[in-house]
Amino acid sequence: MAKESPQEKEFLQLVKQHERIIYKLVNVYAVDEEEKRDLIQEILYQAWKGYAGFEGRSAFSTWLYRLSLNTIFTFRRKESRNGTKTGAVAAEPWEDEQANSSLEAKMLLKAIRELPELDRALISLHLDGYAHAEIAEVVGLTETNVRVRVHRIKKHLITTLNG
């Protein structure tokens, strides 16, 4: 077994530290367990491939979030072109104790999964506690646009959940 290089050790440590980002996004966008596994594997592959180019101009978590979203969107476009499953809304809730503990959380997750891809990314980042400036950096929008869109998404979710 080959010894890990310092770069590999650093990468693995950073991924371990921020793995929740990957799992949360995959659970929001993926339909079934097989698709989740495929996406996680592809995200990790793309992250390792791109890690040498990570210059630290943003936080690793921001870089990983952006890379994960790009990988998910590319994966879904490929599935769409190939005529395989895509765009379906997953029925199962997040594999998170807090989400599983209440009906409201399950309903919220279902409503989030029904949002367009970019809106899902915006609200996921917002719910993860990212500031509007950080979200703007991740998704490539202006901070003002992010603020407005997040506000509209929240209003839409409230309307949806209140029937």
Language model features: what each stretch is:
Residues G53-E55, R66-T86, S101, R152:
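Arg/Lys-rich amphipathic alpha helix in sigma70-family domain 2
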Residues V15-E33, G50, I112:
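Amphipathic, Lys/Arg- and hydrophobic-enriched alpha-helical face
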Residues K24, D38-Y45, S58-N70:
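Structural recognition of an alpha-helix C-terminal capping motif at a helix-to-coil junction
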Residues E92-E137, I158:
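Amphipathic alpha-helical segment used for protein-protein interaction
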Residues I43, L67, L122-I123, I135-A136, ...:
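Hydrophobic positions on the alpha-helical face of helix-turn-helix-like DNA-binding modules
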Residues E4, E42-A59, K78-E79:
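Sigma70-family region 2
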Residues V139-G163:
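DNA-recognition helix of helix-turn-helix
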Residues M1-K24, R37:
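A short, charge-rich alpha-helical start-of-domain segment used by transcription regulators
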